[in-house]
Regions:
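Acidic, low-complexity intrinsically disordered segments
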Residues: 8, 20, 24-167
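Acidic, divalent-cation-chelating loop motifs in proteins
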Residues: 3-19
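Active-site-adjacent bridging/hinge elements
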Residues: 1-2, 112
Length: 167
């Protein structure tokens, strides 16, 4: 994939992606940086569910990303690969993520893979995500009649000290 050089320069955790972990390394230094005070290590469970199992052409899938037991979440990201012949990215809403900067990117890779990368990070010292919440809602438009079969990969929650929980 011709994206390797682009990704490799900023891929600090070596997973082949520019994700919340990599972005957090810079984001914690912005806007006067983050407080050195100790926080609990990041924790939480994330679930991703569509509103229906079956979609007709033109239907919009509402994909809810929920967090349970969130602690010290300063950034999060995941990848959602999809077939551009079957789905079209419509948008993402994330009111529960407060001041987090939305770096979501709908990317067509040089090898033809289409992947949505919902990515949110705090810039500098901002409130963390704590507790249970609907983290975001991703909307995808079906281009044909189909069952919902999209699966996320490379999900992570990151705290301001770059501790990580994978999902």
């Amino acid at each position: 994939d011709g994206d390797f050089d682009y990704v490799s320069k900023g891929d600090l955790n070596g997973n082949g992606l520019l994700d919340a972990y990599d972005i957090m390394s810079v984001a914690v230094a912005l806007n006067d940086g983050v407080s050195p005070r100790k926080v609990e290590n990041v924790a939480g469970e994330v679930t991703i569910e569509a509103d229906k199992k079956q979609y007709n052409a033109g239907d919009v899938a509402v994909i809810t990303v929920s967090g349970k037991g969130m602690k010290s979440v300063n950034g999060l990201s995941f990848a959602l690969p999809y077939d551009a012949q079957e789905w079209e990215y419509v948008g993402v809403e994330a009111p529960a993520l407060g001041q987090m900067y939305n770096m979501t990117y709908d990317r067509l890779h040089t090898n033809g893979d289409k992947v949505l990368y919902p990515t949110f990070v705090n810039l500098g010292e901002q409130p963390n995500i704590e507790g249970d919440a609907t983290l975001m809602v991703v909307k995808m438009k079906a281009k044909k009649k189909q069952k919902f079969a999209l699966k996320h990969t490379n999900g992570m929650l990151v705290d301001k000290h770059q501790n990580v929980v994978l999902f």
